[in-house]
Amino acid sequence: MFRTMLGGKIHRATVTEADLNYVGSITVDQDLLDAAGIYPNEKVAIVNNNNGERFETYTISGKRGSGVVCLNGAAARLVQKGDIVIIMSYVQLSEPEIAAHEPKVVLVDGNNKIRDIISYEPPHTVL
């Protein structure tokens, strides 16, 4: 049996752009994708902390060091520049793999620069 577990997460990223006319997806600074273990073209779930929207799309590699987090296509209607989002990828693991699995949680500052990378989320803690 396989279970779906959090693989990587970029926590509280700031939306830098929303481009309705692009084909689709989310463009993310490649440094952030690497830190979270998320690949270009990988399916991700997005949560918008400002309005509660939850949706899925796939990633596109953005310029390294740019801090870009741009929602493209129809997803651009679900965010505004300056919104705070959480970007999550998931992995399928067998039960024996779960015990050794540690997700990568990337904490960023207001400019989408890496502040810290952790492998757990303490309960009842504001990060």
UniProtKB/Swiss-Prot annotation:
<dbReference type="Pfam" id="PF02261">
    <property type="entry name" value="Asp_decarbox"/>
</dbReference>
<feature type="binding site">
    <location>
        <begin position="73"/>
        <end position="75"/>
    </location>
    <ligand>
        <name>substrate</name>
    </ligand>
</feature>
<feature type="active site" description="Schiff-base intermediate with substrate; via pyruvic acid">
    <location>
        <position position="25"/>
    </location>
</feature>
<keyword id="KW-0865">Zymogen</keyword>
<feature type="active site" description="Proton donor">
    <location>
        <position position="58"/>
    </location>
</feature>
<comment type="similarity">
    <text>Belongs to the PanD family.</text>
</comment>
<keyword id="KW-0210">Decarboxylase</keyword>
<keyword id="KW-0456">Lyase</keyword>
<keyword id="KW-0670">Pyruvate</keyword>
<dbReference type="GO" id="GO:0005829">
    <property type="term" value="C:cytosol"/>
</dbReference>
<protein>
    <recommendedName>
        <fullName>Aspartate 1-decarboxylase</fullName>
        <ecNumber>4.1.1.11</ecNumber>
    </recommendedName>
</protein>
<keyword id="KW-0704">Schiff base</keyword>
<comment type="pathway">
    <text>Cofactor biosynthesis; (R)-pantothenate biosynthesis; beta-alanine from L-aspartate: step 1/1.</text>
</comment>
<feature type="modified residue" description="Pyruvic acid (Ser)">
    <location>
        <position position="25"/>
    </location>
</feature>
<dbReference type="GO" id="GO:0004068">
    <property type="term" value="F:aspartate 1-decarboxylase activity"/>
</dbReference>
<keyword id="KW-0068">Autocatalytic cleavage</keyword>
<comment type="subunit">
    <text>Heterooctamer of four alpha and four beta subunits.</text>
</comment>
<dbReference type="InterPro" id="IPR009010">
    <property type="entry name" value="Asp_de-COase-like_dom_sf"/>
</dbReference>
<keyword id="KW-0566">Pantothenate biosynthesis</keyword>
<feature type="binding site">
    <location>
        <position position="57"/>
    </location>
    <ligand>
        <name>substrate</name>
    </ligand>
</feature>
<keyword id="KW-0963">Cytoplasm</keyword>
<dbReference type="InterPro" id="IPR003190">
    <property type="entry name" value="Asp_decarbox"/>
</dbReference>
<dbReference type="GO" id="GO:0006523">
    <property type="term" value="P:alanine biosynthetic process"/>
</dbReference>
<comment type="function">
    <text>Catalyzes the pyruvoyl-dependent decarboxylation of aspartate to produce beta-alanine.</text>
</comment>
<dbReference type="GO" id="GO:0015940">
    <property type="term" value="P:pantothenate biosynthetic process"/>
</dbReference>
